[in-house]
């Protein structure tokens, strides 16, 4: 589903822990890292797509997280011309995204990157809050900066009043 401007509707997911760290996932078979994200299907709300993508990409369900915030507006990024599939119709030139900030309420061990026959990620780790802005692929950097700026006060407030969660190691490889 591509809009009239050539953008694919999409959700992005920032998962944080009680220390204010965020989950950073390594793309399957690659050296690039990013937050979970995925397309919104026809007839699906952004929140429904977020829960579907959350399960497909990291094996978490509604019971494992709580929604802390979502971006006020849709955020867009353009794909580099070399990544645009010019032979498809309609042509998708980028993504327009609604972002969600989630707090992990379950143990880290619940994260499972192997729920799909074609996994998006093969590893993950907790990183400092601003780390992804510097590390994400360049064409997504402005969107990441805007998302993290919008969610910063919510995440920082968690550190002042953290809920009790089970502790677990800071880095996990794929489960399965």
Swiss-Prot record:
Q: Where is this motif: Nudix box?
A: 38-59
Q: Which residues form the Nudix hydrolase domain?
A: 6-149
UniProt xrefs under Gene3D superfamilies: Nucleoside Triphosphate Pyrophosphohydrolase
Database matches in InterPro entries? Nudix_hydrolase, NUDIX_hydrolase-like_dom_sf, NUDIX_hydrolase_CS, NUDIX_hydrolase_dom, RppH
Instruction: Look at the named UniProt entry and state the broad enzyme category this protein falls under.
Output: hydrolase
A Gene Ontology molecular function term for this protein is:
mRNA 5'-diphosphatase activity
HAMAP family cross-referenced by the UniProt entry: Nudix_RppH
Protein name, as recorded: RNA pyrophosphohydrolase
Q: What is the lineage of its organism?
A: Bacteria, Pseudomonadati, Pseudomonadota, Gammaproteobacteria, Enterobacterales
Gene of this entry: rppH
């Amino acid at each position: 589903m591509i809009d009239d401007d050539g953008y694919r509707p999409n959700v992005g997911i920032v998962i944080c822990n009680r220390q204010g760290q965020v989950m950073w996932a390594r793309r399957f078979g690659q050296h690039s890292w990013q937050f979970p994200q995925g397309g919104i299907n026809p007839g699906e709300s952004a929140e429904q797509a977020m829960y579907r993508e959350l399960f497909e990409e990291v094996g978490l369900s509604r019971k494992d997280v709580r929604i802390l915030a979502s971006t006020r507006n849709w955020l867009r990024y353009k794909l580099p011309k070399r990544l645009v599939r010019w032979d498809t119709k309609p042509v998708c030139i980028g993504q327009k995204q609604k972002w969600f900030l989630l707090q992990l309420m379950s143990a880290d061990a619940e994260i499972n990157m192997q729920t799909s026959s074609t996994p998006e990620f093969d590893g993950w780790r907790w990183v400092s809050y601003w780390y992804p802005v510097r590390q994400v692929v360049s064409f997504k950097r402005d969107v990441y900066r805007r998302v993290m700026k919008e969610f910063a006060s919510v995440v920082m407030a968690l550190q002042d009043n953290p809920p009790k969660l089970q502790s677990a190691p800071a880095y996990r490889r794929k489960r399965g």
